[in-house]
């Protein structure tokens, strides 16, 4: 599934409303098999290329349908949980819906466990301040993020939950080095806080 201004991260939960006929058919097939499908962001920079129809970004995420409610009008509401980053290798076919070939991508630590833990803890503190100032639900998300000890999982859930700019989210999704991802997120949160407190 290729969606504009969207980046799903591993471990993150994304609600989706399925209404297009092609995606209704895809969902029927997915629910009848392994409940897995990929979500790729629409690469707007490539959208104007000749013969480019909904070009996906190179890095996407495979997710699993955790819950699905079918509506009387044929639409569905579902909750998709990201499982792993993938590289979009090719588009296999478009009809009746897009199917892509993917290759699983793995993150690398990029630094020692101790260095990543220090950065994760400092980032958790900054995000906690940011989310406490945010709208409803911020305190709960901040409390949840404080319980996530693994720097890789933390960086993914934090990026999905805190970052509002889809282009920045996509760059974070494409960053396989966990230390670098944490640093990018740290810089983003710091910059946002400076703007808030001006």
PLM feature spans:
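N-terminal low-complexity, acidic/polar interaction/targeting segments
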Residues: 1-198
């Amino acid at each position: 599934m290729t969606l504009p201004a969207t980046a799903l991260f591993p471990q993150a939960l994304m609600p989706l409303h399925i209404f297009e006929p092609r995606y209704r058919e895809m969902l029927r097939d997915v629910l009848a098999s392994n409940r897995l499908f990929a979500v790729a962001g629409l690469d707007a920079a490539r959208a104007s290329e000749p013969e480019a129809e909904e070009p996906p970004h190179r890095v996407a995420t495979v997710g699993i349908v955790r819950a699905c409610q079918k509506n009387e009008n044929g639409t569905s509401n579902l909750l998709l949980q990201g499982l792993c980053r993938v590289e979009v290798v090719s588009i296999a076919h478009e009809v009746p819906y897009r199917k892509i070939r993917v290759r699983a991508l793995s993150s690398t630590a990029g630094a020692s466990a101790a260095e990543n833990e220090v950065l994760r803890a400092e980032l958790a503190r900054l995000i906690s301040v940011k989310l406490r100032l945010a709208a409803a639900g911020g305190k709960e998300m901040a409390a949840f993020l404080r319980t996530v000890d693994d720097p890789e999982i933390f960086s993914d859930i934090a990026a999905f939950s805190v970052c509002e700019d889809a282009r920045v989210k996509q760059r974070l999704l494409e960053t396989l080095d966990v230390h670098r991802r944490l640093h990018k997120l740290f810089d983003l949160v710091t910059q946002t806080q400076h703007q808030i407190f001006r």
